[in-house]
């Protein structure tokens, strides 16, 4: 086979340079870029952060007023629970009314806890903390060992001490 050696030549057209045609009839100013109708992530995050800060700072600016009637009711209910705990703990284990007294105490303590556990204003009070702890210890003992089982001396002393400190805190408004 005979090979033909051919060289490729590039053809370059000789055209005049292209000049854009300018129409001078009516030229309007350039249009502004189109408006965004969607939020960017940074816009959303800054909006979310601002709203979070505002909602949390509103609580400090205008705290909810606690009425004196609610405070008096808390003091009255708490004092009643304290006296019921003391009277139940002071009963002799041979007393035939121990089981009924324990049932009344559990009912009173459950209603007290259900009523005041939701109150955020009371959660930081020393009286609430001490009463709640003592009621938890008493209820836990009677649930575990039955209503006629006597509370051990050490646990009883701790419960009565918590009752005393809670009573002192109540008189001080804490």
UniProtKB/Swiss-Prot annotation:
Residues 1-35 are annotated as: Disordered. InterPro entries: PSII_Psb27 (IPR025585), PSII_Psb27_sf (IPR038450). GO terms for biological process: cellular response to light intensity; photosystem II assembly; photosystem II repair. The keyword Plastid applies. It comes from the Eukaryota. It is found in: Plastid, Chloroplast thylakoid membrane. The modification Phosphotyrosine is found at residue 132. It is a peripheral membrane protein. GO terms for cellular component: chloroplast; chloroplast thylakoid; chloroplast thylakoid lumen; chloroplast thylakoid membrane; extracellular region; photosystem II; thylakoid. It holds the Pfam family PSII_Pbs27. Its main location: plastid. Transmembrane segments: none annotated. Signal peptide: none annotated. The modification Phosphothreonine is found at residue 94. Disruption phenotype: Plants grow slightly slower and are slightly smaller than wild-type. Somewhat photoinhibited, in strong light the amount of D1 (psbA) protein decreased faster than wild-type and thus levels of PSII are decreased. The keyword Phosphoprotein applies. Keywords: Chloroplast, Membrane, Phosphoprotein, Plastid, Thylakoid, Transit peptide. Probably involved in repair of photodamaged photosystem II (PSII). Belongs to the Psb27 family. This is Photosystem II repair protein PSB27-H1, chloroplastic. It comes from Arabidopsis thaliana.
């Amino acid at each position: 086979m005979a090979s033909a050696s051919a060289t490729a030549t590039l053809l370059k057209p000789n055209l005049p340079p292209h000049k854009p045609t300018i129409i001078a009839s009516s030229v309007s100013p350039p249009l502004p870029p189109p408006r965004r109708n969607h939020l960017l992530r940074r816009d959303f995050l800054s909006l979310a952060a601002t709203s979070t800060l505002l909602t949390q700072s509103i609580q400090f600016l205008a705290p909810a007023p606690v009425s004196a009637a609610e405070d008096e009711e808390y003091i009255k209910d708490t004092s009643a629970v304290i006296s019921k705990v003391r009277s139940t703990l002071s009963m002799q284990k041979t007393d035939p009314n121990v089981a009924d007294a324990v049932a009344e105490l559990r009912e009173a303590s459950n209603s007290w806890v259900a009523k005041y556990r939701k109150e955020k204003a009371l959660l930081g009070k020393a009286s609430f903390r001490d009463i709640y702890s003592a009621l938890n210890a008493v209820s836990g003992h009677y649930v575990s060992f039955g209503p006629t089982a006597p509370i051990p001396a050490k646990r009883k002393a701790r419960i009565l001490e918590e009752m005393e400190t809670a009573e002192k805190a109540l008189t001080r408004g804490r």
